[in-house]
A protein has these predicted regions:
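Membrane-interface helix-boundary motifs at transmembrane edges
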Residues: 8-13, 72-80
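Juxtamembrane "helix-exit" motif on the non-cytosolic side of transmembrane helices
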Residues: 34-42, 71, 96-104
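Canonical alpha-helical transmembrane segments
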Residues: 59-73
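Membrane-helix boundary connector in multi-pass membrane proteins
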Residues: 74, 78, 85, 91-113, ...
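Membrane-water interface at the C-terminal end of transmembrane alpha helices
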Residues: 118-136
Length: 136
């Protein structure tokens, strides 16, 4: 009998639970944007861009990559930093669009969505602040 020399590394969601929560939030936002093709209606010149499924797809891909990074045992600091900065940019764009729509349409749910995006953005900033910046 040959002895199996493979080492199986244990994957734990307890290592980076905030990253998993952020990744799930991004996947949720992406699904909402993909499922609703007429979510954004203002400004008129940007509606095709904002309602494109590519925007929702980017949210989903970044969310999945953040979850994958958090479950991986070879966590690279540069990858984490880049994913979190891209997330901040996406959330800032989304929150700005939500507030603009709320102002133009007067619909309170757009303001609510904008505030929720800001809260997730602040959560992202807190993760960035707590994350390692370099190898020590």
């Amino acid at each position: 009998m040959s002895k199996n020399n493979y080492k199986y590394e244990k994957v734990s969601i307890n290592n980076h639970p905030q990253h998993i929560i952020l990744g799930l939030a991004l996947v949720g936002v992406g699904l909402i944007l993909i499922c609703n093709d007429y979510y954004f209606f203002w400004p008129p010149f940007a509606t095709k861009f904002l309602n494109d499924d590519l925007i929702g797809g980017i949210f989903i891909v970044i969310g999945i990559l953040i979850i994958k990074w958090s479950l991986d045992n070879r966590n690279k600091i540069a990858v984490n930093r880049n994913l979190l900065v891209i997330t901040a940019g996406l959330l800032a764009l989304e929150a700005t669009a939500e507030f603009c729509h709320g102002y133009v349409s007067g619909q309170p749910h757009m303001f609510t969505a904008g505030f929720l995006e800001i809260i997730v953005l602040l959560f992202d900033f807190s993760i960035i602040g707590k994350s390692k910046k370099r190898h020590y």
